[in-house]
Amino acid sequence: MRRVTYSPSYTLVPTYECFNRCTYCNFRAEPGTDRWLSLEQAEFRLRSLPSGSVIEALVLSGEVHPKSHRRTAWFRRIYDLCDLALRLGFLPHTNAGPLSYEELAQLKRVNASMGLMLEQVTPALMQTVHRHAPSKQPEVRLQQLEWAGELRIPFTTGLLLGIGETAADWVDTLTAIARLHRRYGHIQEVILQPHSPGSSQTEIGEPFAPERLTETVAIARQILPADIALQIPPNLVSPQTLLDCLAAGATDLGGISPIDEVNPDYAHPQADALAAQIRPGGWRLVPRLPVYPQYDDWLYSAIRERVQGFREWISETGQLEPESGEHDADR
Ligand SMILES: O=c1nc2n(C[C@H](O)[C@H](O)[C@H](O)CO)c3cc(O)ccc3cc-2c(=O)[nH]1
Ligand SMILES: C[C@H]1O[C@@H](n2cnc3c(N)ncnc32)[C@H](O)[C@@H]1O
Ligand code: SF4
């Protein structure tokens, strides 16, 4: 049976507050109105997870303006949350919007991989869905991908589909990702994320037409180098569309967490249910780490050792539970 991967994950949200206002967002809170996640709360939540059930700590955040006086404290909290997750035996993956070169370099110390969606490179969206979202400027996001390449950070990016772009725009965005990967070799996966309206977005947009996703997968597979994984979020598509996307070249189902914080109206299926859902297509669902194996030697040694421990565990047991049942790497 052919393999399809997913990452057993748990999402930590340092803050929902965000200075951008993407019209499709169901995540953001107004700056100043949201309490930040404390390290104590985060530790409690991570320690409450059934042992051996989760590998990735996805640190997903709203953004504080780069020039705000609160930026340093915000960044510090993100760094500390990653450091905590690592100490508790998880592998962090951070997506906190565009970061400065120095911030990226710092977070590399405490992350197995990082990510930022390119969304779409057409500047036209800065007049529509992104008109109040300066951090969605294509140049800013392209710059971030370039810096991640220079810093040798295994990186996840992707396209948000159905936000007013054309099919020609998909080609431009995918071509930009392919070009960056040919230069730096750091793009581990590309997410094809269908815009999915939720109950708290500021403008109700149309959902991305599911029939078109298969077409997008085929185009992405043609444009992207073969070593880049293609990720489809299984909670945002129908079971049939998911099978069609796998047949068209999708290889991964992303992080599966108790709650999809970005799209809280769409429950993540449990891994068992997902495995059963794709089995009729001849697909076997297997867990993966947030960093793909070809990047292990880019990691700082403390993270690399942790990663290699997880790899041995998955290959020995073929499943997730560690033999000791212990998930605390401190000891
Ligand atoms: O549960 C989710 N995980 C999301 N993830 C998590 C992602 O699936 C995994 O963290 C990576 O595949 C690494 O394992 C993102 C990660 C990124 O770097 C960029 C965007 C996303 C978007 C989502 C999302 O909408 N929902
Ligand atoms: C973290 C990523 O989640 C995506 N994102 C934000 N809002 C939505 C939505 N309503 N539907 C689907 N994806 C969304 C964006 O692509 C962002 O970069
Ligand atoms: S999608 Fe990200 S950048 Fe846009 S408003 Fe939501 S949290 Fe902020």
Model-derived regions, located:
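Active-site-proximal loop/turn and secondary-structure-junction residues that shape catalytic pockets
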Residues: 10-12, 63-65, 96-100, 120-122, ...
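Auxiliary Fe-S-binding modules of radical SAM enzymes
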Residues: 171-331
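Acidic/polar, glycine-rich intrinsically disordered N-terminal extensions of enzymes
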Residues: 1-5, 299
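Short acidic/His/Gly/Ser-rich catalytic and metal-binding motifs that mark active-site loops
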Residues: 21, 123-126, 198-201
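Hydrophobic faces of well-ordered beta-strands that scaffold small-molecule active sites
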Residues: 4-12, 55-59, 92-94, 114-116, ...
